[in-house]
Swiss-Prot record:
(2R)-3-phosphoglycerate binds at V1, D2, F3, N4, R17, S40, H41, G43, R44, L99, R100, H147, R148. The lineage of its organism: Eukaryota, Sar, Alveolata, Ciliophora, Intramacronucleata. AMP binds at A192, K193, K197, G216, G290, E321. This is Phosphoglycerate kinase. Monomer. It comes from Tetrahymena pyriformis.
């Protein structure tokens, strides 16, 4: 399962991902298994035991949603875990501790000095063997991690493997949207770093008609294209090197790229920041940060949404957590909701964007809110 949920003060802040897997869990329990073992990661402990990333706070929320007790084990592999699982009875539900507390899950760890350390292949093999020993068949309901070559995804060696209901629902939505979209097809990308979204941008250029690039990652594009001063805005040096390549591909494919033309800037990231509007010509002065789309950009984005019949959105347009930098993302969501009501298909993904949708109480106003995205 993908129970990689945000925590606050030791409690689950947003249970969406847990709720997503409840139908699969209930279906399995209806079959009267001897036991059901749930495994997940939470955050990025980088192969080390980091208490703030423990799965333990998930237990009360999971018990509440299922209406039954859940047993928590403080590790995910090893003799004690194997014994506890072996002795389970009467459909007992067991939640394992964070898989990523072990370097063998991701194949690497980060040591105290901040260096990447490759996991020992023999240890990885043992880790996978221990996970495999915990069950007789394997169900993958973790859409958010299904693309990763991690031990829990690819190393659990059971002849019977199945997709859970959540994974199926996600794949059905995405395959329809990506393989036979109603056109025009618009993708909206935001967030901080270009390099994190290179593969996504490249693959979407092959499929879409228009692409909005906003949020922090837009400034790397604008600096490369217009040599624009971006002040203290986010800049991705690695991403900068491949902007030309991405734009050339878009041009060759006839994909229209929309970048911001003006920006709401702040002199800090905080709620009490002073604000100014800047544009492509003025650039952003030193000491100022582009934190949201400006009014002209908001209007241009609205026009692009109004033309679209399929919309996939991953990544906010600004620092929406602060009210004064929320309008670009909130207005875009309003436009996407209206377009959905008029018959368009809309898919929202990525942790931050999903948070925005929930805060704006718009979950029912878009076609599908994906559990994918995030760490």
């Amino acid at each position: 399962v993908d129970f990689n949920v945000p925590l606050k003060d030791g409690q689950v802040k947003d249970p969406t991902r847990i709720q997503g897997s409840i139908p699969s869990i209930k279906k399995i329990l209806e079959q009267n298994p001897k036991g059901l073992v749930l495994m997940s990661h939470l955050g990025r402990p980088d192969g080390n035991r980091v208490e703030k990333h423990s799965m333990k706070p998930v237990v009360p929320k999971l018990e509440q949603l299922l209406g039954t007790k859940v047993k928590f084990l403080n590790d995910c592999v090893g003799k004690d875990v194997e014994e506890a699982v072996k002795s389970s009875r009467n459909g007992e539900i067991i939640l394992l501790e964070n898989l990523r507390f072990h370097a063998e899950e991701e194949g690497k760890s980060i040591d105290a000095a901040g260096n990447k350390v490759k996991a020992d292949p023999k240890a990885v093999k043992e880790f996978r063997k221990s996970l495999t020993s915990l069950g007789d068949l394997y169900v993958n309901d973790a859409f958010g991690t299904a693309h990763r070559a991690h031990s829990s995804m690819v190393g659990v060696d059971h002849k019977i493997r199945a997709a859970g209901y959540l994974l199926k629902k996600e794949l059905d939505y995405f395959s329809k949207a990506l393989e036979s979209p109603n056109r025009p097809f618009l993708v909206v990308l935001g967030g901080a770093k270009v390099k994190d979204k290179i593969q996504l941008i490249e693959s979407m250029i092959d499929k879409v008609d228009e692409m909005i690039i906003g949020g922090g990652m837009a400034f790397t594009f604008l600096k490369r294209i217009h040599n624009m001063e971006i002040g203290n805005s986010l800049f991705d040096e690695e991403g900068y090197k491949i902007v030309d390549q991405l734009l050339e591909k878009a041009k060759a494919k006839g994909v229209k790229i929309h970048l911001p033309v003006d920006f709401l800037c702040g002199d800090s990231l905080e709620a009490n920041a002073n604000t100014q509007i800047h544009d492509l010509i003025s650039g952003i002065p030193k000491g100022w940060i582009g934190l949201d789309a400006g009014p002209k950009t908001i209007a241009l984005n609205a026009d692009a949404v109004a033309r679209a019949n399929t919309i996939v959105w991953n990544g906010p347009q600004g620092r929406f957590e602060v009210d004064k930098f929320r309008q670009g993302s909130a207005d875009l969501l309003k436009r996407v909701s209206a377009r959905t009501a008029a018959g368009a298909t809309s898919i929202i993904g990525g942790g931050d964007t999903v948070n925005l949708v929930q805060q704006e109480k718009a979950t029912d106003k878009v076609s599908h809110v994906s559990t994918g995205g995030g760490e």
